[in-house]
Each structure stands twice: as structure tokens, then as C-alpha cells.
């Protein structure tokens, strides 16, 4: 979802919140900020998705994102790739809820924008609902109000990113239950949803739908 695709998507939908590709915090803090973050005003509303695990570096990147005019800052806790795991961000951070909470607290302390998260229902052999509930509870305590849940677990180091988009079974019921258990939070469902007809039933049980592939 680079700026060119987002411009095209905005022509199709005038109101949908669009997201950037995941951008690593250090790339923003040390790299060409304009090249990485500049976007056309017509793309708005648009969220900047960050990858990282350092509260300090994520906070710095969050502030840069706010200064560039983004409408939301999203922390990626769902990417399962080996490269991402090696650098300690993405889905592997589901193993470290307290670190994630520290990151989110620091990010929120430097911005007035909403800070949100995108994650999965579990990882490897950890896929029980109780663990997901505990993870979300820990993050909720920081003040985060919006949780985007890919209704598959992440198989870390075992599947390719493409396989992780298809092989782990979808468990939409986990996301529905999260909404029941966290009625005051915004719970958005993601995973395997590719048409408007498929969206409608999910909207009866969650607050929104994210489409990554269609």
C-alpha cells in the first residue's frame, strides 16, 4: 500500500481509512523521512503503521508521523516474517506483552493522535482465547482503544509470510468474543475477507473490517 496505490484506492472509496506499509521506526528516525512518509493530501484519512520494539525509537517515529500529517499511528504486532522476527518486531512481540505496553505508553505520551495496534489471535502453539484476552487486557490498560485483529495465529519461523496469510485457520469467533468481552473498545476484524457481501455479517459482531487483500 504505497502512496500510489493509496491514491488509487481513495478514488474507489472516499471515506475508508487507509494504511501505509509497515515502516520500521529506525528507518524513519535515521533515513529520508520525506521519501518514506510523504503522501498526497487526497489520500486522507491515512494511518502510519510502524514496526519496532524500542519505546524510545517508536515514540520518536510517532512524533515524526504526527508532524507529517497522518491521522493515526498503528503498531504492527502481526507480521510473521523471519526477518521481522529477527529484528524483534511484528508478531513475535505477542510473547512480550509488557514490552508492548511500554511501547504504546511511550508512543501515546508524545502524540495527540490515536495509537492503535494490529495483531493476531496467537502464535505457534499459543492459540487459546485466554492468552489473547490477557494480551489485549494488558495493552488496553495503556489507554489504547482500537484493536485490529487478524483472526489467524502466526507461525513464526515455520511458514513464509504468504503461507501465514492462508494456512493457519481463521477463527473469527475469537474476535467476536473479544468484542463481547471489551464492549467499550473498538474491535476491528481482519483476515480472509474479500468482498462487501462478506463484510456485512462481521459488522454485526465487530466495530469494523480491515481488508488487506481483495
What label would you give each PLM region?
Residues 1-214:
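Flavin-dependent oxidoreductase catalytic cores
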